[in-house]
Every structure is written in structure tokens, then in C-alpha cells.
């Protein structure tokens, strides 16, 4: 996990807590196919699990706690709903298969004795289960989180200092104490009374992971979170604030579907892979070229910062607000969109809206001019926030502090979800075999792909700037490969290799390392898609991991993306290297 990123600005104040944890000498485990940077820093004990099988391991750990009498039934009885139904799954009453450590060992690649020892070690000590946001981007990704909460409940430490579980420590100062002050908002995202020019057909809002499927199948109906959604017939795409040609699985399939609409418009500050697939590009200013305002720390809310314009807009770029105000004007609803405010007037309003809540926090925020001239305002951190324990109030009195669940308790079994009768997400957490992974290895595609976030990027942002060279090999995205897998393929560090799946192929630069388990490769997510014709066919020559991944929903419940799932093969590249051109400005059609 990393903590160097945020939706807004950040003080990186959580890093101090990680340093303190290391200094204290607290034992940590890294249960991951990859020995990541956090594990390296903490010198964690590595439990190298097969990709997508963590859920089976946790089920087996709960089984071990239950059959040895160590599951905390006092906690389960008082604070959870559905243990009886989940236990039936655990003991094989549903499918005839007991979820024993031996069962999980065959799936996960972890020895049964290791699973047993891990379960007892977690029970014997005050244990915090910490996860990032990559694990849900696998097939059946919802199950991991549900099973993790179930494991935490069986351990019985939820609501105790240093115990329980947490899900957002990897970014935005997650885990840092919450400061005493209002969160700074933004321009409202819902503008009334704007309505479609023509009667709308299909769902008005789609989850972003549906984009390819929706473009391919207009009018199709899909199950989603207990409801039905109908894909509209997209005639035009207007994309801002994202780079689907980096973040969406099976990029070559997306490329084909992207051609179906009549017109594609992209607003961005750089020539991303997505901008290169647009008919019209509206060049937006960078943060240096216009004024803005931001909270400091998404999770910690440390204060407010004035983002002063440093230089005038370069070339033909304009601020996003100017671009959309002008479009609204052309469409006849400028007043409804702008509410009669300039960009600077919106910034002042946003600040004053927050300042208007000062009394709630018993603080006195400066007037806007004082704030803007100084450039920032920091909130104090109360001692109570430094001592905050997640779910402590719930543990103290679950009836007075009900959770936002069906029962008000920790929902181990959900009658609501069970009522959907989905075959890929039942009423409780359970293990499903991923569509691709270690267990699905074939002679043609024997390796499992992992695609974690890149160390030098935020998703695909910053791949185009000079610091990309800090990690590239021959201008290609690195691929981590275990020495055993590299030796059998006569690959050494520094070689350019071809990585191929059933869906596509890409070039990458080999890094031979023990930090990835045998049978698994790692290509960090976020390289820019750069397809070229080569003697080996049309391939991505820069190394976008999603050129390889499978595009299917996690399940009918969340329909999330599975951008870290795929079977691949790696071979040494012996042909002439095609140049990487995705960072070179394309020629414009005038």
C-alpha cells in the first residue's frame, strides 16, 4: 500500500504513523502474490498467495478458528447478523465441501499448516486487517471484502484499539486523525432544470466499467445491484477527467467499440491515449494555469488551500469551467450552469459555504480575502480524533449506534442480496474460482497477471512526464517476473519481452525479482496505450497492462472492473524495437 496520493492536496501525515509502526516492531504480514513496497519497508513476513484466492484463505482461517473453539461467539452473537447461514457454507452444508485449510491450500498455494498458524497468530494478538483498493479489481472482487469483515468478526476485535479492519490506508491520508473543520466542496454536479433535448431511452447513469459493453450492445438489459439497467444507444461521447484507454480492461476491445459513436469529444490537459482516440479535443488548463480551491486531505480534512494561478493559460488551453460555460451558452442554458458566477466568484462562494459552518466546529475561519492572500488555512486536530477507534461506539452500544445495514449489525448474511438470486454473488461471502488466474493456467498462457498501481504514477497520470524514465526499460513499462519463470524462458533483467494474453499483446521491460511468486507476473497499471503493427501482429508497444486483461464484471451485484485478472505468456522480443510514440504530440487535422 502507498500513501503518496490523494484526490485533493495532502500533507502525507499518515506516513509518520507507518514509520512509528515500524519503529515499534509490530509484526506485520504481507498476504499478496507480490512483496510490495510497504512490505519491503516494514520487513513483513510474506505469505505468497495465488492471485484471486485470498477469499478461500480467509474462509479456511475462519473454519480453523471455529473448529478449534477460538471463534469469538460472544462477539458474533451480539454484533453480527447471519453467522448461522455463513457457518453452513463454512461447514459444507451447502455444497458438501468443508472450507478447511487443506481445501484452501490446493487453491491458494499456501500450505495448510501456514493457514492454521496464521489464524491462531491473528487470534492470539491484537490484530488489524488492513487492505488497499486493488484486491476488489479481480474477478468476484466483492467477496474479498465481505470475507475480510467476516474474519474480523470471528476474531472479535472490531471496535478495539488496534483491532478490527480498515480499507483506506493506502491513499488520501487514510488512518490519519480527522481535523476539526468543514470539508470544502465544489460546484454542484446536478444542474436543474436541464433535461435531455429528446426523450431519453435507457438508464441515465451507468457504472464506468460498463462502457465497452454498452457501446457494443445498445438497448441490452443487464442485472445490477438488484435492479435492471438498460444501455442507451450512444451517438456521442464527451469524456473528461479520465483515461479509459488506460484504466479500462481489454483495451483492444474498447478501441473497437469506441469507433461506434458518431462523435467523441475529450477534454484533457495532455495528449492521453484517450485524447488520441477522439474526434475533437478541448485543451484544458493545468492546475498551474487557473485559480482553484481544495481541501487538504480527503480523509483527514486538515484544512483548505488556495490554488493560485502561477502562469497564464498556455496556447489554446482554457479552464474546464470556461469550456463548459461556453458549451452551456451555445446550448442555451448558460445561466443555469454558471448561476451568474465567474470562476473566481465560485471559488469565493465555495470557501464561504465552508466558512459558514465554522460555528458547528467552534472555530473562526478568516474572511475570504485573508485566506486567499495567505494561501491556506489549517484546522486543529483534537486529541479525541487522535484517539479515535473505528466502530468503538458501535461496540459499546450496538443498539444506540446501529450500522447502515439491513439489521443495523455487521451483516455476515444478507437476505436482500440473497433475494437477488445471483449465481455470482450469494447472500454471504464465499469463494468463487476466477475466470482466469493460477488455477486457469494453460500451456499457451501459463502465467497469472497482477496489475497493481504504479509507484511513479496516479493511475495513468504522470506517465508522460520525465519521471516515467525512473522506472522504464527501453521506454517500456517494466514487468516483474520470478527467477524460475525467467530462467525457463531465457529472460534476464533488461530484456524487452512480449507479454501476450487471449485478448492482446504488449511489450515490456523485464525485471527478474524474487518479490513476485513463481507463476505470477506484475505489470503496474497506468502505462499509456500505444498500438502499433509489428511482425508479431498489432500490439501495444508501451506496456499498458489492460491490453491483456479480461473485460467482465466482478458480479451482477457491483459490476466492477477486473483490471487485475488474466492469464498470459512472456517471451523474449527479438525483432527490431518499434518506437514509443504515445508521448509525441500527434499531427492535428485542420
Please state what every model-predicted region is:
Residues 34-37, 272-307:
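Flexible glycine/proline-rich, aromatic-decorated loop/lid segments
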Residues 22-25, 29, 34-124:
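Long, well-ordered, tryptophan-enriched scaffold segments
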Residues 61, 81-216:
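Active-site phosphate/pyrophosphate-binding segments
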Residues 42-49, 285-292, 302-313, 466:
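Short beta-alpha connecting loops at secondary-structure transitions
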Amino acid at each position: 500500500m502507498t500513501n503518496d496520493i490523494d484526490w485533493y492536496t495532502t500533507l502525507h501525515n499518515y506516513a509518520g504513523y507507518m514509520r512509528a509502526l515500524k519503529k515499534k516492531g509490530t509484526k506485520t504480514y504481507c498476504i499478496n502474490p507480490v512483496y510490495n513496497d510497504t512490505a519491503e519497508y516494514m520487513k513483513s513476513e510474506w505469505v505468497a498467495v495465488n492471485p484471486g484466492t485470498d477469499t478461500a484463505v480467509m474462509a479456511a482461517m475462519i473454519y480453523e478458528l471455529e473448529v478449534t473453539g477460538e471463534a469469538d461467539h460472544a462477539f458474533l452473537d451480539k454484533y453480527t447478523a447471519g453467522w448461522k447461514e455463513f457457518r453452513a457454507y463454512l461447514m459444507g452444508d451447502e455444497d458438501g465441501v468443508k472450507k478447511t485449510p487443506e481445501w484452501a491450500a490446493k487453491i491458494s498455494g499456501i500450505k495448510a499448516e501456514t493457514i492454521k498458524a496464521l489464524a491462531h497468530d491473528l487470534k492470539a494478538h491484537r490484530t488489524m486487517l488492513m487492505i488497499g483498493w486493488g484486491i476488489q479489481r479481480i474477478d468476484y472482487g466483492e467477496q474479498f471484502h465481505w470475507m475480510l469483515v467476516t474474519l474480523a468478526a470471528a476474531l472479535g476485535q472490531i471496535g478495539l484499539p488496534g483491532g478490527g479492519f480498515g480499507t483506506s490506508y493506502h491513499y488520501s491520508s487514510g488512518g490519519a486523525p480527522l481535523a476539526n473543520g468543514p470539508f470544502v466542496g465544489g460546484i454542484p454536479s446536478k444542474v436543474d432544470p436541464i433535461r435531455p433535448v429528446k426523450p431519453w431511452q435507457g438508464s441515465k447513469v451507468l457504472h464506468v466499467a460498463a462502457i465497452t459493453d454498452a457501446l457494443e450492445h445498445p438497448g441490452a438489459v443487464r442485472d445490477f445491484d438488484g435492479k435492471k439497467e438498460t444501455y442507451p444507444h450512444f451517438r456521442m461521447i464527451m469524456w473528461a477527467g479520465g483515461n479509459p484507454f488506460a484504466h479500462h480492461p481489454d483495451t483492444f476491445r474498447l478501441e473497437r467499440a469506441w469507433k461506434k459513436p458518431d462523435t467523441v469529444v475529450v477534454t484533457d490537459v495532455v495528449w492521453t491515449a484517450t485524447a488520441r482516440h477522439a474526434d475533437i479535443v478541448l485543451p484544458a488548463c493545468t492546475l498551474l494555469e487557473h485559480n482553484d480551491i481544495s481541501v487538504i486531505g480527503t480523509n483527514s480534512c486538515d484544512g483548505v488551500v488556495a490554488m493560485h494561478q502561477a502562469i497564464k493559460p498556455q496556447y489554446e488551453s482554457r479552464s474546464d469551467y470556461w469550456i463548459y460555460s461556453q458549451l452551456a451558452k451555445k446550448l442555451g442554458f448558460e445561466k443555469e450552469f454558471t448561476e451568474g458566477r465567474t470562476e473566481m466568484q465560485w471559488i469565493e462562494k465555495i470557501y464561504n459555504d465552508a466558512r459558514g459552518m465554522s460555528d458547528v466546529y467552534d472555530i473562526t475561519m478568516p474572511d475570504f480575502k485573508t485566506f486567499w492572500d495567505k494561501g491556506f488555512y489549517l484546522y486543529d486536530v483534537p486529541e479525541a480524533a487522535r484517539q479515535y477507534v473505528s466502530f468503538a461506539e458501535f461496540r459499546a452500544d450496538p443498539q444506540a449506534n446501529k450500522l447502515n445495514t439491513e439489521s443495523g449489525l455487521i451483516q455476515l448474511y444478507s437476505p436482500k442480496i440473497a433475494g437477488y438470486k445471483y449465481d455470482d454473488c450469494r447472500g454471504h461471502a464465499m469463494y468463487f474460482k476466477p475466470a482466469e488466474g493460477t488455477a486457469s493456467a494453460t500451456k499457451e498462457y501459463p502465467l497469472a497477471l497482477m496489475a497493481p498501481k504504479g509507484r511513479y504514477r496516479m493511475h495513468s497520470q504522470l506517465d508522460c512526464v520525465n519521471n516515467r524514465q525512473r522506472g522504464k526499460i527501453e521506454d517500456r513499462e517494466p514487468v516483474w517476473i520470478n527467477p524460475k519463470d525467467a530462467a525457463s524462458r531465457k529472460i534476464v533483467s533488461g530484456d524487452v519481452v512480449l507479454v501476450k494474453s487471449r485478448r492482446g499483446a504488449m511489450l515490456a521491460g523485464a525485471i527478474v525479482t524474487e518479490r513476485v511468486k513463481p507463476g505470477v507476473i506484475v505489470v503496474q497499471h497506468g502505462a499509456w496505450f500505444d498500438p502499433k503493427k509489428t511482425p508479431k501482429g498489432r500490439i501495444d508497444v508501451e506496456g499498458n497492462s489492460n491490453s491483456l486483461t479480461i473485460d467482465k464484471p466482478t458480479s451482477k451485484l457491483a459490476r466492477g472492473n477486473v483490471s487485475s485478472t488474466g492469464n498470459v505468456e512472456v517471451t523474449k522480443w527479438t525483432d527490431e524495437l518499434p518506437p514509443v510514440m504515445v508521448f509525441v504530440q500527434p499531427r492535428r487535422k485542420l
